[in-house]
Amino acid sequence: DIQEFYFKRAMKVTRYEDEFCYYVRKPWGIPTTFGKEKSFLEYLFEWSEKSWSYPFISLLSKAFTKDEERGLLNRLDNATTWLLYFAKTPQIKQAYKDLQKQGRVYKYYLLEIWWDIGYWIKKYGNSIDFPIAHHKFQDDRMVVLLTSDLKSKIKWASHEVKTKIEDYSYDKQSNRAIVLVSIQKWIRHQIRSHFSSIGYPILGDAIYGKKKERYDGDLQLFSIGLRVGS
């Protein structure tokens, strides 16, 4: 099974831990958790009896139920890759939830975009804080409310979220920039739709990318870590 081989390979080289969490790399193109499609969590825990599995899988199965998502602390969009965090105990998961409610959890991502974001930062600052809502007619995308007339396209209420640009590096030759961002609150496709809405789409974005800018690779958006602030 080629899919099993792929996940087996990914797991062997990209799992580590500290005193609070296990950190596992989620591959591209698969849902994080249980839903309509088979998810990364299902593959991970279905194979817990395999000889190549790590002990942490069975430990999480004992500590958390399926409804508790086996201790999962964050979710990534299907097309986003790299770090998922799993709490080692229910107490750690609850402490994380409490910190998140207090706005003290900062999640960090690296992304690659078209063009020099420095121009936008000089004019508007380093935060993108337009509200985001689910699209009324297209289930696979979100709407960024740059103007009030876009409210006719939204389903349900909008979400007040902020994507903060922490740092960036622009390469003039390729006309691309590597950007480090942080978020606190999170809504589906937040970083992708925010950057596209201001004219700097992420490379490989099949939904929010610009068709005239050709890039055949996967979405260049990576979950790289988190920080607890004061």
Predicted regions: what is each one?
Residues 1-230:
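RNA pseudouridine synthases
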